Design a protein with these regions (language model features):
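RNA-binding accessory domains that recognize and position tRNA/RNA substrates
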Residues: 1-3, 9, 17, 160-185
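Flexible gly/pro-rich beta->alpha loop and the following alpha-helix that scaffold active-site loops
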Residues: 3-72, 77-83
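Secondary-structure transition/hinge residues
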Residues: 22, 104, 181-185
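A short hydrophobic/aromatic micro-motif that marks alpha-helical segments and, especially, helix-coil
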Residues: 23-24, 138, 176
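Intrinsically disordered, low-complexity regions
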Residues: 43-45, 134, 185
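Pocket-forming structural segment of enzyme catalytic cores
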Residues: 56, 61-65, 70, 77-168, ...
Length: 185
């Protein structure tokens, strides 16, 4: 059975990420972000959202785990910042129902959502500059970089929350990530 580890960065929806994955029939374990990656045996990693980059613990170490990684909200920001991109305060903070335009239908993570989808956003900061190797795969009027991908390294991020019911095609994001994990297994 596929095993996905959700690294808990103290986000308000982390438990929903684990539930969404379990509902898709995979073994999903939520681990504290102080858990060393070498203590985890997984086919993929989800870096959860959270309130503050100063509280991500050892989560950045999971970027070297040699398995696909999906960053959600703060998790995406963590990927960008750790790999040389930039994160800054967004113009629109708080909660919002957002229409996201998907750039291409061939992206492994969000391509199936093209040309657009409605999502639930809950963030004050956002990725403002992509790290080398990443492409912008979705954007919106409130956040220029809503999703990013580096398929060669199997690193992906979404600024929105696919795990909440307000995100119309959130389950598809997790299904697509599981397909990436299965391809790499």
């Amino acid at each position: 059975m596929t095993c996905i580890v959700v690294v808990d960065n103290h986000g308000q929806f982390t438990h929903l990420e684990g539930r969404a994955l379990r509902d898709l029939g995979v073994d999903a374990d939520i681990v504290d972000n102080e858990t060393p990656p070498e203590e985890v045996d997984a086919d993929g990693v989800v870096l959860s959202g959270g309130p503050d980059m100063d509280r991500v613990g050892r989560a950045p170490e999971y970027l070297e785990a040699d398995v696909p990684v999906l960053g959600i909200c703060l998790g995406m920001q963590l990927i960008a910042e750790e790999l040389g991109g930039a994160v800054d305060s967004g113009d629109y903070g708080g909660y919002a129902d957002v229409t996201v335009e998907v750039e291409t239908d061939d992206d492994p993570l969000v391509g199936s959502l093209a040309p657009e989808t409605r999502v639930w956003a809950s963030h004050a900061d956002e990725v403002t500059e992509l790290p080398d190797g990443f492409v912008r795969t979705a954007g919106s009027d409130v956040c220029n970089i809503e999703a990013m991908s580096d398929p060669d390294r199997e690193l992906y991020g979404v600024q929105w929350h696919p795990e909440v019911a307000h995100t119309e095609e959130g389950e598809a994001v997790f299904e697509n990530f599981l397909a990436v994990c299965a391809d790499g297994a």
